[in-house]
C-alpha cells in the first residue's frame, strides 16, 4: 500500500514537473517573455542578449525612413516627391543604418564615449547625427512597457516614455514578430514618424510659452504697416524646369525709443485661411531711428524642381498675403532682444 502511495506521489511530482517544463518552454516562445528579456538585457548592458530579442538593424532600417517622413512633415517639405533627393537618401541609407546600428549596440553595451572607433565616412556620419537629433534619448526614460496585442505571427507592445524636460509622456508602439528560431523580436517602432512629430510639437509649444514675453517685446518694437507680394516668372525655360523671383515688400516702423541697427526676421506667405504656404529667413543691417518707417524689400529665387517652390509658383500670388515675424533685434544702445531656441 505504501509502495503504491510512493509511486503515486512520484507520478504527481513528475506530472507537475512536466507541466512546469511545458509551460516554461511555451512561455519562452511568447512576446511577453521576449519583452522582459529585452528589458533585462538593456539593464544589464548585455548587447548579445538584447539582439536576440530586438532586431536592431531592422529597427534602424525602418527608423531611417520614418525619421525622414517626420522631418518632411515638420518642415512642410515632402522630400519623397523629389526624385533627386530621394535617390541620394537611398544611396546613403545602408551606410547610415550601419552607423546607427553600431552606435545603438555600443550604447547598450555601455561602452565609454572615448572608446576607439573605426573612422566613419563624414557624409553618412553627418546624416546619422542629423537623424538622431530628432529623438533626444538622454531626455527620455521608460515609464511603462507592456504587451498590448498578440495576433498570430505578430504582436504589439506599448512603450510609455517620459520626457523629463517637457514633463510629458509619449507612446511608442513596438511591432514584434517571431523569427526562424522561435524567438520573438522587436522589428520596428510602428508609430515612430508620428512620435517624432508629436515630440517636436511639444517642444515648440514649450518654446512658444517660454518665449512669449520675448516675442511680445519683438512685435512691439517693430510693426509692419503694409505688405505686398509679387512673383515674376523667368522667360527662359530649360525643359520642364521653371524659375521665378518672389518679391516681398514690407513697410516696417520702429516703435521703440531706441534706434535699431540690425534685425533678423522670417518672411511668411499665407493663404486666405491664415495657413503657412512658404517661409524663408531674412535680415536687415542699417539704422532705423525711433518712429522711422523703412521699406524692407526681399527677393527669393524659386525653382520648379523644388516641390514647395513649384507649389508657390502655381498660385495666384496676388490673392495670398505676406507677414514678417521678427526673431532678433539689436539696438543702438547695445540691447538685444532674441528668443531662446529650445528646439534642437
Where do the protein language model's features map onto the residues?
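Terminal connector regions
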Residues: 219-223, 278-279, 301-344
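Transmembrane signal-anchor/signal-peptide helices with a preference for the extracytoplasmic
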Residues: 17-38
Amino acid at each position: 500500500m505504501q509502495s503504491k502511495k510512493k509511486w503515486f506521489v512520484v507520478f504527481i511530482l513528475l506530472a507537475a514537473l512536466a507541466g512546469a517544463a511545458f509551460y516554461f518552454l511555451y512561455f519562452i516562445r511568447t512576446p511577453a517573455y521576449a519583452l522582459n528579456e529585452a528589458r533585462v538585457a538593456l539593464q544589464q548592458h548585455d548587447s548579445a542578449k538584447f539582439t536576440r530579442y530586438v532586431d536592431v538593424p531592422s529597427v534602424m532600417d525602418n527608423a531611417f525612413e520614418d525619421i525622414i517622413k517626420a522631418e518632411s512633415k515638420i518642415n512642410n517639405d515632402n522630400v519623397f516627391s523629389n526624385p533627386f533627393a530621394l535617390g541620394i537618401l537611398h544611396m546613403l541609407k545602408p551606410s547610415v543604418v550601419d552607423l546607427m546600428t553600431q552606435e545603438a549596440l555600443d550604447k547598450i553595451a555601455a561602452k565609454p564615449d572615448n572608446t576607439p572607433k573605426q573612422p566613419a565616412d563624414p557624409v553618412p556620419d553627418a546624416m546619422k547625427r542629423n537623424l538622431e537629433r530628432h529623438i533626444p534619448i538622454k531626455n527620455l526614460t521608460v515609464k511603462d512597457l507592456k504587451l498590448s496585442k498578440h495576433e498570430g505571427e505578430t504582436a504589439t507592445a506599448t512603450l510609455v516614455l517620459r520626457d523629463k524636460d517637457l514633463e510629458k509622456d509619449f507612446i511608442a508602439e513596438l511591432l514584434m514578430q517571431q523569427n526562424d528560431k522561435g524567438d520573438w523580436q522587436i522589428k520596428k517602432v510602428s508609430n515612430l514618424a508620428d512620435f517624432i512629430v508629436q515630440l517636436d510639437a511639444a517642444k515648440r509649444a514649450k518654446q512658444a510659452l517660454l518665449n512669449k514675453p520675448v516675442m511680445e517685446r519683438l512685435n512691439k518694437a517693430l510693426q509692419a504697416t503694409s505688405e505686398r507680394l509679387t512673383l515674376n516668372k523667368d522667360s527662359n525655360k530649360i525643359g520642364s524646369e521653371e524659375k521665378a523671383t518672389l518679391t516681398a515688400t514690407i513697410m516696417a516702423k520702429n516703435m521703440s525709443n531706441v534706434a535699431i541697427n540690425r534685425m533678423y526676421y522670417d518672411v511668411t506667405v499665407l493663404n486666405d485661411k491664415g495657413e503657412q504656404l512658404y517661409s524663408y529667413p531674412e535680415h536687415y543691417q542699417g539704422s532705423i531711428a525711433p518712429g522711422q518707417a523703412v521699406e524692407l524689400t526681399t527677393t527669393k529665387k524659386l525653382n520648379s524642381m523644388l516641390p514647395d517652390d513649384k507649389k508657390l509658383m502655381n498660385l495666384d500670388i496676388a490673392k495670398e498675403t505676406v507677414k514678417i515675424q521678427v526673431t532678433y533685434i539689436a539696438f543702438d544702445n547695445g540691447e538685444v532682444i532674441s528668443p531662446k531656441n529650445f528646439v534642437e
